[in-house]
Amino acid sequence: KPSGYESYKDYDITKDFKDGEKSDAVSHDYLYYSVMSEAQDVMYDYLVKRDKVSSQDLKNDKTKESYRERALQELQAGGYSVKTTIDNAVYNAMQDAASQYGGLLDQGGNSGVEVGNVLMDNATGAILGFVGGRSYENNQNNHAFDTARSPGSSIKPIIAYGIAIDQGLMGSSSILSNYPTNFTGGTPILHDGDKGTAMMNLQEALNTSWNIPAFWTYQMLQRHDVDVEGYMTKMGYKIANYNIESLPLGGGIETTVAQQVNAYQMLSNGGVYEKGYMIDSITDRTGEVIYQHKSEGVQVFSRATASIMDNLLKEVVVKGATTQFHSELKNVNGAAASADWMGKTGTTDNFADAWLFVSTPGITLGG
């Protein structure tokens, strides 16, 4: 971690308010609206609890909407101070990078390609910085927290291999089939147009991100009646149908950057999922802290499973078969490249989406 991470978390959203008036969209950006959205959720919960609103009353949409409006009004005019986890230096550096190099995404005849990134503290889930998009003025969709897309192959270590290892059905040296295979309907399972090869170990399957081994691994989980949904629900995933054959390849899954970063945070945190958050505390005008974030870690994978998966994904980064991240980082910052990196890529059909998630023991960055 760069020095100052623990002390330089000083973005206070309430400083953006002017005379208690509501903000206008022109003067704010992704940061303001992302923080405000989470702060409104926190304030809503506080007001409902303070006023002892019953669960029965909250079934009334008008009551819920009324309290959401009150939550926003309280934040804007109630004299509250909202402290976040956002590190200004980190956040600004991420915006500068997106601004200076975002144009590279438009090469090759592409135009308007968007970007979303999240940087998360592994031990706590604190979000230290993010990129919501290339330009809030041109596109108000928040590609870090709101836009949901297929995760492609980046889901393989989470929904297939990780669960199989955790269930004792697979080990780090397991041999898997990559022989040509079809989906039930007869469509070949391809990898960059390749129909498959032969048997291979798990490390090779991950390094190249072959699809067929992940397919068969998920089939094995289903044959053994493994509660895959139980695992995924612990991490906040909402998947409508767990019987989709292409699920371990990203089919039938829609996820945000923040959600997927959180899954890799779990792998780098001994299997403990710490839900990502930006609101550290809210203090009222008298100085009383009405909200303080508290850790509610959930053990998703065993520590042993997380360690095995972490080691496998280290070689994925170092070998560089699917990403040049490590070699390019060496050229830019040798000290940063020497960190204990692990990670995984993911792409969707016709490269509509391209993902990369990388972690050190301290932080996870992805998008």
Language model segments and positions:
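Short loop/turn motifs at secondary-structure junctions and domain boundaries
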Residues: 106-113
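Structural recognition of the beta-strand scaffold that forms the well-ordered cores
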Residues: 83-84, 116-120, 127-131, 174-175, ...
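Mid-domain, small-residue-enriched loop/turn segments at the edges of structured enzyme/sensor domains
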Residues: 187-190, 194, 222-262
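Non-catalytic, structured segments within soluble enzyme domains
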Residues: 1-81, 85, 233-234, 238, ...
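Conserved catalytic neighborhood of penicillin-recognizing serine enzymes
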Residues: 22-23, 169-228, 244, 273, ...
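Stable alpha-helical elements in mature extracytoplasmic
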Residues: 31, 35, 39, 86, ...
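A penicillin-recognizing enzyme superfamily signal
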Residues: 84-105, 117-119, 130, 137-147, ...
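Active-site SXXK
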Residues: 94, 125, 149-176, 205, ...
